[in-house]
């Protein structure tokens, strides 16, 4: 039973007074920054390129205000997340979001104005004013986007239209989370319960096939019923992506999305090529699942139930000890920051009524790299802890070693830091496993994670690319078109006939990531790169571990592929993917041998 917020032990809550001591301090800062933005609006547009000094002054002021806006937003959103029922912090978050929008509108002049400068004048100013070199990579990235930046007036119009462009995804979110009431279903205790998005995954992990089947059919009956509405929101969202790409003179929505993070399209293509080549491994794993479960007619609702009965329990204190022990492999510097996270209350540990579900790592440049958890004492919670700690260590190292302008990192790099930790935890637990049953459970856990992250997210990425291409070619994305396409791709990946699994054709309708604009492929590349890097960290040299820390410290001071190359990964080559699939095959082979021994019985 979840507690009220005030019943949680203080040491298990995050300390947000390290951001602002009081709410009044936050409110005063909000008022001050609003005034500062109003002043900027009156004084700075039209003057960016008056001189080298003007370029430096206006740039530094913009970055300083951005830094303060981020800090305000982080406090408001985290206060809201700890108890979403509190109207005060809902209002704070709305005000902070509005401030972000205002910041975007006020500084809409910056990029179009900057891009009026010639490379010759820019290089001359760089030679004259040493401090401009601090921002050279930022300016270089702007020059790289020059062909895609519009006039100041057009940029301001686009910024103002931001809320309209967000409406398809917001409509989906409200409809899917607030308006839709899912059916009642039976749980393992034969009790009728309300099916929710939150409890669906646990029902799909049930050992009782009847429970799984009923929950699965109940969920997808909803998506079948409202398929035309979901198709319309997704179609409109795809049109927004394609329109924005066209407005900015990109060849496609995918090119626009990847160029925004300076990721070459080749990375996406190399991933898809490797995935298609290794689909027989997934088919082999599905066949093994059939054998272990003793089901000849395996269905999509049989994919998620764990194959092991072993019940790992970790209380939080044990989880902390294990995380510290596992992550000590990175050396003294990393170990010290992990210790600080646990001792200085960076982590909000327990579930409470009204608290946001799930887990994340957050914070801003000027704050601790906070983490939100909802600890339930499972093996997954331990993996979540080291995962979020990976993000937080990435943030802490970046902020300590980079100025604000380069003090963040793209999602493309973020998922590598978190899942490297998960892979090292798996390696450690496998090494420590006492018997075949433990080993069987851990191998199953890792193989399922790989399937769910590398194969499944690539399946989503393939569907996402195809629907954007179809819309651009004039195809109408009706529910019939989307159902047919999704069913076909799902069959290709899982080798389970679409006609035997009719409900799965509606799965596209429930995936929020299809509204994120070519985002999901990064989960697959991230997990594969992390698998490759974890092997280097665990089995490699001190130099390999040092190179990994260099990647964590680099932030966005170079292009993403240059940053991850510091750790030893070439994302345009299939090498890291081949190594990841090789490990998948080795662990799958080991699981097959354990099954031959009857360990699963």
Swiss-Prot record:
Cleaved signal peptide residues: none
Family named by the database record: Belongs to the peptidase M3 family.
Note accompanying the cofactor annotation: Binds 1 zinc ion.
Keyword set includes Hydrolase: yes
Required cofactor(s): Zn(2+)
InterPro entries membership: OligopepF_N_dom, OligoPept_F_C, Pept_M3A_M3B, Pept_M3A_M3B_dom, Peptidase_M3B
Binding site for Zn(2+): 387, 391, 394
Role, per record: Hydrolyzes peptides containing between 7 and 17 amino acids with a rather wide specificity.
GO MF annotation: an example: metal ion binding
Organism: Lactococcus lactis subsp. lactis (strain IL1403) (Streptococcus lactis)
Entry superkingdom: Bacteria
Pfam families hit by this protein: Peptidase_M3, Peptidase_M3_N
GO biological process, one term: peptide metabolic process
The protein's Enzyme Commission number: 3.4.24.-
UniProt keyword Metal-binding, yes or no: yes
EC class: hydrolase
Keywords carried by this UniProt record: Hydrolase, Metal-binding, Metalloprotease, Protease, Zinc
Catalytic residues, chain numbering: 388
Protein name (database record): Oligoendopeptidase F homolog
């Amino acid at each position: 039973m979840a507690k009220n917020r005030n019943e949680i032990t203080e040491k298990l809550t995050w300390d947000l007074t390290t951001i602002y001591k009081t709410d009044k301090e936050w409110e005063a800062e909000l008022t001050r920054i609003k005034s500062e933005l109003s002043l900027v609006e009156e004084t700075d547009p039209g003057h960016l390129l008056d001189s080298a000094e003007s370029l430096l002054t206006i740039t530094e002021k913009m970055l300083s205000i951005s830094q303060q806006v981020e800090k305000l937003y982080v406090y408001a959103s985290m206060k809201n997340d700890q108890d979403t029922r509190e109207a005060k912090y809902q209002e704070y978050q709305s005000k902070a979001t509005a401030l972000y929008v205002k910041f975007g509108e006020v500084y809409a002049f910056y990029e179009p104005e900057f891009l009026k400068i010639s490379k010759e004048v820019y290089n001359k100013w760089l030679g004259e004013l040493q401090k401009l070199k601090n921002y050279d990579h930022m300016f270089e990235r702007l020059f790289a986007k020059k062909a895609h930046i519009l006039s100041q007036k057009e940029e301001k119009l686009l910024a103002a239209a931001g809320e309209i462009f967000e409406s398809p995804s917001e409509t989906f979110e409200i409809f899917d989370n607030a308006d839709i009431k899912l059916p009642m279903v039976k749980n393992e205790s034969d009790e009728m319960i309300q099916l929710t998005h939150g409890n669906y995954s646990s029902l799909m992990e049930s050992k009782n096939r009847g429970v799984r089947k009923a929950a699965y059919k109940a969920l997808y009956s909803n998506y079948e019923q409202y398929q035309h509405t979901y198709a319309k929101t997704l179609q409109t969202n795809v049109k927004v992506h394609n329109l924005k790409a066209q407005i900015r003179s990109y060849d496609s929505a995918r090119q626009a999305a990847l160029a925004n993070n300076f990721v070459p399209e080749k990375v996406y293509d190399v991933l898809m090529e490797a995935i298609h080549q290794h689909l027989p491994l997934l088919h082999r794993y599905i066949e093994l699942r059939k054998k272990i479960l003793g089901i000849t007619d395996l269905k999509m609702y049989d994919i998620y139930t764990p194959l092991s009965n072993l019940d790992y329990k970790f209380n939080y204190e044990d989880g902390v000890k294990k995380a510290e022990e596992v992550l000590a492999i990175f050396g003294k510097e990393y170990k010290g920051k992990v210790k600080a996270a646990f001792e200085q209350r960076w982590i909000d540990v327990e579930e409470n009524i009204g608290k946001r579900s799930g887990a994340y790592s957050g914070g801003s440049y000027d704050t601790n790299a906070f983490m939100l958890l909802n600890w339930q004492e499972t093996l997954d919670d331990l993996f979540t802890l080291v995962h979020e700690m990976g993000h937080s260590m990435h943030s802490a190292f970046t902020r300590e070693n980079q100025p604000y302008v380069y003090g963040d990192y793209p999602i493309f790099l973020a998922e590598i830091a978190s899942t490297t930790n998960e892979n090292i935890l798996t390696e450690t637990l496998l090494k420590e496993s006492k018997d075949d049953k433990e080993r069987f459970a851990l191998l199953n856990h890792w193989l399922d994670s790989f399937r769910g992250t590398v194969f499944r997210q690539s399946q989503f990425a393939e569907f996402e690319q195809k629907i954007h291409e179809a819309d651009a070619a004039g195809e109408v994305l009706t529910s019939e078109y989307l159902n047919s396409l999704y069913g076909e791709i799902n069959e290709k990946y899982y080798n389970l006939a679409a006609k035997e699994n009719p409900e799965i054709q509606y799965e596209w309708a429930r995936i929020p990531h299809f509204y994120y604009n070519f985002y999901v492929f990064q989960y697959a590349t991230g997990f594969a790169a992390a698998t490759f890097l974890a092997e280097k960290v665990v089995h490699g040299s001190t130099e390999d571990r040092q190179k990994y820390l260099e990647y964590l410290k680099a932030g966005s001071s170079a292009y993403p592929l240059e940053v991850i190359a510091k750790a030893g990964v070439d994302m345009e080559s299939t090498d890291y993917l081949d190594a990841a699939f090789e490990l998948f095959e080795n662990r799958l082979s080991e699981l097959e041998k354990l099954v031959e021994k009857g360990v699963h019985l």
